[in-house]
Amino acid sequence: MERRKFLAGATAGAVGLGVPALTDDATVVPRQSPAFGRPGKDFPKVCGDLGNTNHSNLSRITRRNVGRLGGAWHVNLEGGSTAQHQQSTPVVRDGVLYVQTTQQNVFAVDGRNGAIKWKTSVGTRTTNLRGVALGDGKVFSTSGANIVYALDQETGAIVWQRQLITADEDDGNGGAGGTLAGAVVHFDGLIYVGMQGSTGGARGRAYALDASTGEVAWTFWAAPGPGEFGNDTWAGESWRTGGAVPWIHPAIDPELGLVYWTFSGPYPRTDGSSRAGDNLFANSIVALEAKTGKRRWHFQSVHHDIWDLDNVMAPVLSDVRVDRRTRQVVVYGSKVGMYYILDRRTGEAVHGMTEKPVPQDVRQKTAPTQPFPGGEPFVPQEPRLGKATRPVPFYETGGLYTPHWDRPVIIFPGAGGGGDWAQLSFNPHTGWIYVGYGLINSGFSNARGGRVNTSRPLGEYFAGGIAAVDPATNTPVWVKDGEWSLAHGNGILTTGGRVMFQGGPDGVLHAMDDVTGDVIWSFQTGAGVHTSPVSYEIDGEQYIAVLAGGNGLPYPDIPKGDHLWAFKLGGTVAPAPAPTPPSKRNDVRAAAVTGTTVTLGRVWNSSTGTPGTTENTVAQNAMSPQHLAVAVGTTVTFVNPADNGFAHAAVSFFEDEFDTGVLMPGDSHAHTFATPGTFFYNDAIFPQNTGKIVVF
């Protein structure tokens, strides 16, 4: 599918995918329900409100004056540490920001000047924390030890604590597996807490706890046990370690009394051979009664997932006009690059849903069909052969839902692509959903028999962008490809001033026009921004705040930090020095080795400084050495050892520097490097074997 872009310039006007030009006064959506608790001067919840709209109605910062935005204050929460990334989005009440760090510290920070009012430690090791909840005078936080804490909002003192994920919760082998994850949500005397661990065989569950005492009010098991609805979608005892974890926070409709929770993929994540069936409630959104945890309805977006396509992004609630009728919808998705827009009361697909036949592999027990919603995807659903993010050569490629077995198959958007877990924003002024997306290939194989999942092929390019999608039609209004993947926590905040904010892996926070998506202001924060900006007001002055600390995915070399920033009109705090941006390619991380020989099909023994003694056709690092550094003019010899059992061939890709041809065991090929550069190459026969040569 040809990439379609929305192009808007100073003189071009608003030209989109068949969408008329909009003005500042355009209002194309019904009045939204006030029951979600829309943010005013506060931003009291991660994603702003119970509907996860990530919209602030504050309007003093506008498209016309945003150029005057500057740093109001800046604080390094962890003393300037660059050792850890940060995924926590702040929440704000009465001029105070509350935020966690990966180092398991919870902070209360004065929103005027950045002064730390209190700090409470809830653990000693590092763990992903994505946001606290506020309610009943308390701050609720999870910890790496699977303890939920209630802290006094004024002092940070511990009010109560509750241990979760214990062996006595369940008689399944996965009952004690996993760790708490996702932002905490507070509503009507309960707090809602999720967990992660599907890649390790945890059995997913969602918790509701009494906010006053910490007692567990209910638990919803997402891999149902015997006698429970959905257990028959798991073969044998596979439900016991079935995964299906809720690692992102839910949305809540107070009027319907429903919690909308999304659940991850099943376990094993890329091998379906032992878990025949649809595997409910993996890859599903489930509407649960807020007070009891009773299932009201569910929708599964991927049956029997073997691609790590868990559409776990926090769902968004909105009211939209569809066929001249106001519909209360939940927007769900989407790594697969398309949204599932469902009726909040019934789960009905408001734009229709078609179960389409998909490619099959009997060994993987693949589902015969997969659901496709009415509308159009916001990213392509097949590899982009002519683009920078084209697949690494020699891999098999396929469209969405092409199965794999012993050899990797590249699909697109991959497990880190589409809209992964960046916070969406629903803008009541335009009526659109805004999403940051990734353009990333995945190349999974079945991990049995010593095979390894390549997941993201080495040497491939990462990219991404932002899209605006009209939920009334489930079609993109505009799509803007950019240089960075923006799918991993890079939340979008929209505001009443018609300005939206989003940060990127390079540390730059952008302000954009909410109609065109054009960048109208930028600021360097000092570390990758993989959280969502928030907005609040003190004494009539509007602030924007964000925590910049980086994230390990999809860029392992992203600049990390602990920078909490606030901005206001006329702010005078200068931007941070620009950090070294991450590599736009999935880089080889092995240390550089000097020499003039590369041995094919062998893993480098770093302790002896020699190639391994056995052939390896499945490992990504089966080039010895995997990272070679040579001077211009050096001749490098590529060798297929005589005791290897297979032919090999080393071919540089994207740069077209060398091609050894097929080398039988005992053969070699020499190539002289005449120009400096970085050259990735892989094996034309066993493509996951990948190396890098840097010529200086």
Task: List the predicted regions and their residue ranges.
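N-terminal export signals
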Residues: 5-24
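Aromatic (tryptophan-biased) beta-strands that constitute blades/sheets of beta-rich domains
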Residues: 29-81, 85, 115-122, 157-166, ...
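Repeat-blade elements of multi-bladed beta-propeller folds
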Residues: 40-47, 83-105, 125-148, 176-205, ...
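C-terminal substrate/ligand-recognition segments
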Residues: 92-94, 99, 417-517, 521-523, ...
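Beta-propeller blade signature
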Residues: 205-213, 281-290, 464-470, 562-570
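Phosphate/diphosphate-binding loops
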Residues: 321-355
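Blade-level signature of beta-propeller repeat domains, shared across WD40, Kelch, NHL, RCC1
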Residues: 535-578
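Extracytoplasmic copper-binding redox domains, predominantly the cupredoxin/blue-copper superfamily
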Residues: 582-696
